[in-house]
Amino acid sequence: MSIVTPYIPREYLALRINYCKQQLAELPNVVRSERNIRGEKKTVLVSESHCYSLNSTSGRKLAEVIQRRELLSCKLSRLEGLWNSAFRGLPPADIEPRKIIRSFVDSTGESVIIDGKFFESLKHNSNPYYPEHKTHYYNGTYYRSAAEADIARFYTEQGIPFKYEPEIWISGMSRPIYSDFVILIRELDLCKFHEHFGLKNSADYTRKTSTTYNNYSGAGLLPELDVFYTYDVDNIPFDIRTLHTKLNSVIYDSLFGVDITL
């Protein structure tokens, strides 16, 4: 049995590395130091030439900064190791974290920006229809297929926030839609809609797929930019590398495809 070569998403990996570097640069410098206080040695935290007790409010906040710096440094080291194993040189500097503005028109005619605030407003697993079809369990949620459970596992392991089947009202609809997945790309403060289609040989399902595509487009969400699609193949397990390639593509197009940054 041959070993499947993993797909490493170049642009998305570069974005994650540069985001880690940006976050580290924004943190204040804090160091632990031993000081003689009233004849007794005590550990204090020093930041911007000021000393803070570990038990003070400021000291506890600075201790959290130290912990966050350590976590980010470990994450950066891991991501850079992955980069060096696959690519030459440094991650491109032009793949930089920044806020990208995309929006859709909701059922009231208002424009809704699909950013972190929108993501937080969504309720995870809110589709009330056909609960009996949710038979595949992962991490506290039942999914409608093994492929959807694998997708949820992928997003969880990659540290990508997602909501499964949240209720969303879009233009032209008399009832809400329930996207399979809405994910948040923190590095761009930008949401993406992910629809996973199965039952490709079913005529009814094919019509549903076409309707879903048209509904998103009618609300101003562009295919393969705001919304991306994955598909089941008969008698073949879903290849998660497909998701890597799709993610990399929509992120690349968000960064360089159109002038939509803020």
Features from the language model and the residues they span:
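Conserved aromatic-histidine-acidic binding/catalytic patches
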Residues: T5-I8, Q67, N139-Y143, K200-D204
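Solvent-exposed, charged helical/coil patches
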Residues: P97-I160
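Short beta-strand-loop-alpha-helix junction that forms the active-site gateway
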Residues: T135, Y178, V182-T212
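Class I S-adenosyl-L-methionine
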Residues: Y155-T156, Y213-S217
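Acidic-and-aromatic substrate-binding clefts and catalytic sites of carbohydrate-active enzymes
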Residues: I168-P176, S202-D204, V233-D239
